[in-house]
């Protein structure tokens, strides 16, 4: 009984890992970072983030990379961007994930990267 439980547990773990990998980064598609809509989404994300107020305001400099995922009628954008701060005299790099459904946007994450 104990051996069959371990085999079942291992099978479930492998299946779960396979499902996670299938739904992971492979579903993101690279898109044109210079596309006007991508630029608009990036501008919105920079204005929306708490980092903007914490650093005295952020200004979008460039979108260095852009990926898109379409899931259940919703667009998700994963953007690698560079912004500058009026207070911190240097360029900062961030990864932003934005949810877009119709005209509605939500900032899923906005994290600094190196």
UniProtKB/Swiss-Prot annotation:
Gene Ontology terms: biological process: defense response
Gene Ontology annotations for the cellular component aspect, listed alphabetically: extracellular region
Domain of life: Eukaryota
Pfam families tied to this protein: SQAPI (PF16845)
UniProt keyword Hydrolase, yes or no: no
One MF annotation (Gene Ontology) recorded for this entry: cysteine-type endopeptidase inhibitor activity
Compartment list: Secreted
Keywords of the record: Plant defense, Protease inhibitor, Secreted, Signal, Thiol protease inhibitor
Matching SUPFAM superfamilies: Cystatin/monellin
UniProt cross-references to InterPro entries, sorted A to Z: Cystatin, Cystatin_dom, Cystatin_sf
First and last residue of the signal peptide: 1-23
Keyword Metal-binding: no
Task of the protein: Specific inhibitor of cysteine proteinases. Probably involved in the regulation of endogenous processes and in defense against pests and pathogens.
Protein family according to the UniProt entry: Belongs to the cystatin family. Phytocystatin subfamily.
Protein name: Putative cysteine proteinase inhibitor 9
The species this protein was found in: Oryza sativa subsp. japonica
């Amino acid at each position: 009984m104990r051996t069959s439980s371990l085999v079942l547990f291992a099978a479930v773990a492998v299946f779960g890992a396979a499902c996670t990998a299938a739904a992971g980064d492979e579903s993101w598609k690279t898109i044109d970072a210079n596309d006007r809509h991508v630029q608009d989404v990036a501008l919105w994300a920079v204005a929306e983030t708490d980092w903007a107020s914490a650093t005295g305001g952020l200004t979008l400099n460039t979108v260095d990379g852009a990926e898109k995922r379409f899931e259940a009628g919703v667009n998700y954008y994963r953007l690698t961007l560079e912004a500058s701060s009026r207070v911190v005299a240097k360029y900062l790099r961030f990864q932003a994930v934005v949810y877009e459904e119709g005209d509605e946007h939500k900032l899923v994450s906005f994290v600094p990267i190196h």
